From Swiss-Prot:
CDD domains per UniProt: Lumazine_synthase-I
Record function comment: Catalyzes the formation of 6,7-dimethyl-8-ribityllumazine by condensation of 5-amino-6-(D-ribitylamino)uracil with 3,4-dihydroxy-2-butanone 4-phosphate. This is the penultimate step in the biosynthesis of riboflavin.
Top-level taxonomy: Bacteria, Pseudomonadati, Thermodesulfobacteriota, Desulfovibrionia, Desulfovibrionales
Domain of life: Bacteria
GO MF, any single term: 6,7-dimethyl-8-ribityllumazine synthase activity
Keywords linked to the UniProt accession: Riboflavin biosynthesis, Transferase
Gene symbol of the encoding locus: ribH
Example of a GO biological process term: riboflavin biosynthetic process
Active-site residues from the entry: H91
EC number: 2.5.1.78
Protein name: 6,7-dimethyl-8-ribityllumazine synthase
Binding, (2S)-2-hydroxy-3-oxobutyl phosphate: A88, T89, R130
Protein species of origin: Nitratidesulfovibrio vulgaris (strain DSM 19637 / Miyazaki F) (Desulfovibrio vulgaris)
One cellular-component annotation, GO: riboflavin synthase complex
């Protein structure tokens, strides 16, 4: 086997600060995502006083809030949590697409990892499945991805 330097992130959140953006729209689903993210970070060493939850109206507002948080310099990582459920109009496509693009730009422009926990589903049932039932909890997954990315970036 070839021996090459490998950089991996450790799942240790001690001493790190995180902002969690949570939409109020579909809050009965988003609250489960938030609970999963907070629990994950706490179990991995992050103190609750080092987590800030920022409630916003909906997914479309995520990028501007993430940008402000990233520019503040107070957070090692940002976790964006929300749920956009497809309806009968193209509204879903516009909101989900713009939020996704905006969050990616914020992460790239600022250098602050932004975890993508925005559910984009065809039904309420699918959203519930991804908020802690059959398909796991995407809030946990977004928190884990941000934590690992923060720790990788410290080594680059």
């Amino acid at each position: 086997m070839l021996h090459v330097k490998t950089i991996e992130g450790q799942f240790d959140a001690k001493g790190l600060k995180f902002a969690i953006i949570a939409t109020r729209f579909n809050d009965f689903i988003v609250d489960r995502l938030v609970g999963g993210a907070v629990d994950y970070l706490a179990r991995h060493g992050c103190e609750r006083e080092d987590m800030t939850i920022v409630r916003i109206p909906g997914a479309f507002e995520m990028p501007i809030v993430a940008q402000k948080l990233a520019k503040s310099g107070r957070y090692h990582g940002i976790i964006a949590l929300g749920a956009v459920i497809r309806g009968a109009t193209p509204h879903f496509d516009f909101v989900a697409g713009e939020a996704t693009k905006g969050l990616a730009h914020i992460s790239l422009d600022s250098g602050v990892p932004v975890g993508f926990g925005l559910l984009t589903t065809d039904s309420i049932e699918q959203a519930i499945e991804r908020a802690g039932t059959k398909a796991g909890n995407k809030g946990v997954e977004a928190a884990a991805a941000v934590l690992e990315t923060v720790r990788v970036m410290e080594q680059l």
